[in-house]
């Protein structure tokens, strides 16, 4: 199925590994041009070169910390200078650290807010005007299953990703008439560094191995396994495409059935 992404320009944050990299690879395979960033300059340059060589896509790779407004602005400026526009925005960042409420001070909340909430807001603030002017745009936010079903020991993620969900849903209402869609993608337990980190935290807390922590999650998932980044990326490419032009304001899970709620 042709998704109609050939020639579109996609900006993908935190794309040196994990879900961000998988989405960047999928969009490039569909013919999109890419602007990708990561805090690790060497890693993102390597990923950019690899994607370009494998797919033939035009790729701009830049080091940027999405929690810093100056870095977001510099990255967006570079993308607009090279490509002239951005049609697709995928906001993404490493999740905030685990922890219970009593272990988190104001500084932890502030740092997590900059990373998880303000980063997508800043990207949208810069790129939304151009999308509205062209009457076509896709904003996709990578959030978490915690917005549907909070997870123990993830106070920051549970709280701030819910804030992103409310912001995105409201923004979808505000810009729908301009041809711009806004959706959230909800990854479940997927084979990424983030899940490895969480498995190690649980292992230390509960006196088990990381492998046993993963097996515990797998028993909670109807499909009986962790997801793969490419499975998440397939949904992202579809939601970013012309084929998904009547989908907006939604939070769509790729979780193997882990979420138990009806809605």
Briefly describe each language-model feature range:
Residues 9, 14-17:
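Conserved glycine-rich cofactor-binding loop
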Residues 30-47:
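Conserved glycine-rich Rossmann-like NAD(P)H-binding loop of the short-chain dehydrogenase/reductase
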Residues 90, 176, 181, 247-249:
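Short, small/polar-rich loop/turn modules that mediate ligand/substrate recognition or access, typified
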Residues 100-101, 105-113, 139, 217:
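Substrate-binding pocket helix/loop in short-chain dehydrogenase/reductase
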Residues 129, 173-174, 245:
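Alpha-helical segment proximal to the catalytic Tyr-Lys
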Residues 140-164, 168-177, 189-190:
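Catalytic loop of short-chain dehydrogenase/reductase
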Residues 149, 237, 248-263:
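Short C-terminal tail/terminal secondary-structure segment
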